[in-house]
Amino acid sequence: MHKFFPRSGFFDFETVRILGTACYGGADVAEVLEAVGEIKSDDAASWEEAWRRQSWWAEALADQAREGGDREAARRAYLRASNYARASGYMYVSDLGAEGGNAPPTQDPRALPVAEKVGRLFRKALALMEGEVRALSIPCGAQALPGLLYLPPPGKRIPGRDKIPVLVFLGGADSCQEELYYLYPAAGPGLGYAVLTFDGPGQGIVLRKHGLRVRPDWEVVTSSVLDYLEAYSAQHPGLELDMKAIAVSGASMGGYYALRSAVDRRVKACVSIDPFYDMWDFGTAHVSPLFISAWTSGIISSGFVDKLMTVVSRLWFQMKWEIALTGTLFGLSSPSQILLNMKNYTLSGKSDGSRANGKKSHSPTDGGGVESDSFLSEVRCPVFLSGAGKSLYLDVDSHTRRCYDGLTGVAAKDKELWVPESEGQGSLQAKMGALALCNQKTFQFLDKVLGVQRVPLDVSAHI
């Protein structure tokens, strides 16, 4: 496939991520190509400037269309302005302080203003949507999580069905709910589904404004969301939400969250797009096992690991960005502590970080290669699971297939595995560049397991 940045797989992937939203109004092809022409490979400053300029231009077009009464043009331009603004701040790097320091990272001072601008522009687009969108405030511990409930237009309700099935869409490590729109919220309401999104701990405005850190036990977060949704549905019976047809979904780290959330018996279906099985295994995948063993056994100090990763990150922007992002999510500045904290994010059931000598967690098994203590054995609902054959981050065998094999409590007929091998068919991480196809696969699965019946379309020519 064509490479926008042949020398930077990271910048290339993130460009496809932006361009891929064009099918749902998040980008325009020529605008993206114009921005690409102004960006230097692995140069965060030129990336920020190019997308900031495109956001400004799209916002000006949106205001012109709004003044002229052109609803569709205004909506699409506000979407692009919001998405380009999000992209402009994507390469910001938090300050981790001194090597191996214990103080939480200091986020780039531009990060919060950009996040607020993204939300402001996106809300203008929401006001011009065909279907109703409701703003929610979801209690979760001491913090209220901002959410959005996308409802199908009356004419798009599923024929013959009294109530509306609900898909709860969970964001991932670097997501905000404004970007989540370009997958399920962009397609679900038109198919008769309500779609709920929210910024949870470590995500979007909740992270940037309130500093709420990520947590591994996302089933607790989703449980709070479902509690709220049940109460909200009871308070608003006219919405006709079907509390017996709730599905959860997510991509990448959101796919991990979705699988953890699927243990809640209120969840009747789960869609997990390109999840990791174990974050520690992901984080150490390209490091020598001997080095990891020497470190975790104390032969090599954490201070040495910190110094080594700091030096490498000065030479490799992608690593610098990844360490800063993960440190911001965890509230940690030491690269070694960031890596060790990844052990808590696992589906193996070993969230106590007890793996000895840094060995990969492929055992113990039940004798057939399936981890007998897997958290996934608690899942009972049907699951649609995908992997990405050309992922920049995750190996299919180390993550996707382990997730599939770990679903021992789900009958084979209720598990679907989709692992495309070409980019056009969805082989990039989180199905970037193939969002419409991901929607098609997802809602076909949900229709099947939630009992949604659709009449085949008549495409015979009547012209």
Swiss-Prot record:
Pathway: Mycotoxin biosynthesis. Its EC number is 3.7.1.-. Pfam families: Abhydrolase_6 (PF12697). The active site is at residue 252. One of its GO terms (molecular function) is hydrolase activity. Keywords: Hydrolase. PANTHER family: ALPHA_BETA HYDROLASE PSOB, DIENELACTONE HYDROLASE DOMAIN-CONTAINING PROTEIN-RELATED. Belongs to the AB hydrolase superfamily. FUS2 hydrolase family. Homodimer. This is Hydrolase pyiE. It comes from Pyricularia grisea. The lineage of its organism: Eukaryota, Fungi, Dikarya, Ascomycota, Pezizomycotina. The gene is pyiE.
